A protein has these predicted regions:
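Non-catalytic nucleic-acid-binding interfaces of large nucleic-acid enzymes and RNP effectors
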Residues: 1-259
Length: 259
């Protein structure tokens, strides 16, 4: 394994090769998600893990604040309430603000993500933002810089991503494909006007990833205005601990009990 910050490295060819391989993946930001986020940020609208700061104005000072003690006390109390709201809002919106700062920096650039192993040998991205292990909003900002040609398999995987991010992550592959194909009007609505139809996607399990998937599916499969796709499609294991143990032990009976 390769442990960042540890000079007593135990190096293995396979872990090093794996780490270098995933660090060679080139990314760019998804312009559709960036533009949607910027519009919602301007309006102070929150969706899922996207929490832009909401501005609170101080109350106007009363004209008699200098000579009226009660008026002065009332103003100070109201102003203190606003200042407390501002402080809470600043704290609540911290991650979103930092993510949007990273977006401004990388908006028109291609970039790579450095990774490292932890003490267990699990790979984690070193940056805190704009990574495949970010929040729902952070992950939705990522596209592969090198797009792939659309195929029938690619169409199925995009349909899979739409349904999975909406909330069908426990459904079978066929159930997910069927759900997407029976909800094309919803997908088109969300993809073509996400601001006016925010109610159609903000309730998804992973709303921002769902929004990104809808836009890609609409452009590549419904309208067919793009013949290249660059959307990352995520798959995740359940019972992963038992899967690993079954694999290490080559235990067929345990392996059959996990997916």
């Amino acid at each position: 394994l390769v442990r960042r910050g540890d000079h007593a490295l135990i190096q293995g060819e396979i872990p090093l090769s794996f780490l270098n391989k995933i660090q060679q993946v080139k990314y760019r930001l998804n312009p559709f998600i960036v533009n949607t986020a910027m519009l919602l940020e301007e309006r102070g609208v929150s969706v899922g893990k996207f929490l832009p700061i909401v501005h609170y104005d101080l109350p106007p000072k009363p004209v008699d604040i200098a000579e009226n003690k009660e008026s002065r006390k009332k103003y100070r109390r109201e102003a203190a309430e606003v200042m407390n709201k501002r402080a809470a809002e600043f704290k609540r919106s911290c991650r979103t603000r930092m993510t949007m700062e990273a977006v401004a920096r990388f908006k028109d650039r291609e970039f790579y993500i450095p990774w490292s192993f932890d003490y267990r040998g699990r790979a984690y991205p070193i940056p805190a933002f704009l990574t495949p292990q970010d929040t729902d909003f952070g992950k939705s900002l990522l596209n592969f810089a090198d797009a792939a040609v659309m195929t029938e398999d690619a169409e199925e995987w995009l349909a899979f991503q739409v349904a999975t991010t909406y909330g069908l992550d426990k459904a079978t592959m066929q159930e997910r494909l069927d759900w997407t194909r029976t909800h094309v009007s919803l997908i088109a609505r969300v993809a073509r006007n996400p601001i006016d139809h925010i109610g159609d996607w903000e309730g998804a399990d992973e709303p921002w990833l769902f929004l990104a998937a809808c836009e890609e599916y609409d452009a590549c499969c419904l309208r067919q205005t793009r013949n290249l796709t660059s959307l990352p499609v995520a798959t995740d294991a359940t019972c992963s601990g038992l899967q690993i143990l079954a694999g290490l032990a080559r235990d067929k009976s345990t392996a059959r009990l996990v997916n």
